[in-house]
Design a protein with these regions (language model features):
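Class I S-adenosyl-L-methionine
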Residues: 1-196
Length: 196
């Protein structure tokens, strides 16, 4: 990704592992199918069949614990984003926050990346996360750009999508900080990446 301001959307009073396991993460991830199924299994630490690429036991949990200890200072979102590259929703869906938060943070940002599983949420800010080709075509018909994980190169729709330039399959030509394709509305093609 490169040097980026990372934003986390977290449950204030429930650690990310517990939020996943109990389903409380719906408040920050909406109806994303990658969340998995809540469980009461005492052996499990997270939801069953969770497919989200974000590892809750690493960065997300560390950030949540630091927040609980009061490590993070408060300040102006506009100042925090000014002249910087911002990753909207490193964890959590940006639709879970008031749009004014993102408007302030991104107002003077150099650029940003953003994705949402919530259909039609702020296409000026976020690319639409599509889990299937059918979902992608539905979003394209509404004029929305998508970000889609594909199982192989043969799944790429070359008329509507391009491979993520930072991906192994595209030769890791550029980091996100230089690419700047993954942000809301633009004339660029939608982005796809082979699952890893």
């Amino acid at each position: 990704t490169g040097h980026v301001v990372q934003t986390y959307i977290l449950c204030r009073d429930i650690n990310p592992l517990e939020a996943s396991k109990t389903g409380a993460d719906s408040t920050i991830c909406g109806d994303c199918v990658m969340r998995g199924t809540p469980t009461t299994d005492p052996v499990r630490k997270i939801a069953k069949n969770r497919k989200c690429y974000v590892n809750l036991g690493q960065g997300v949990l560390i950030v949540w614990k630091a927040f609980q200890r009061g490590v993070y200072k408060t300040g102006s979102a506009r100042d925090m984003g000014r002249g910087r590259f911002v990753r909207v929703g490193t964890y959590g869906d940006p639709a879970a926050c008031p749009a004014s938060v993102w408007e302030d943070l991104l107002a003077e940002a150099d650029t940003f990346t953003a994705y949402s599983h919530q259909s039609g949420w702020r296409p000026d800010i976020a690319m639409q996360s599509a889990d299937t080709y059918e979902q992608a075509t539905a979003h394209w018909s509404e004029g929305r750009r998508t970000f889609r994980v594909i199982t192989g190169l043969e799944d790429l729709d070359k008329t509507k999508e391009t491979l993520c330039p930072a991906s192994k399959e595209a030769g890791r030509r550029v980091q996100c900080t230089a690419c700047k394709l993954c942000k809301g509305s633009s004339l660029a093609k939608s982005i796809a990446i082979v699952e890893h």
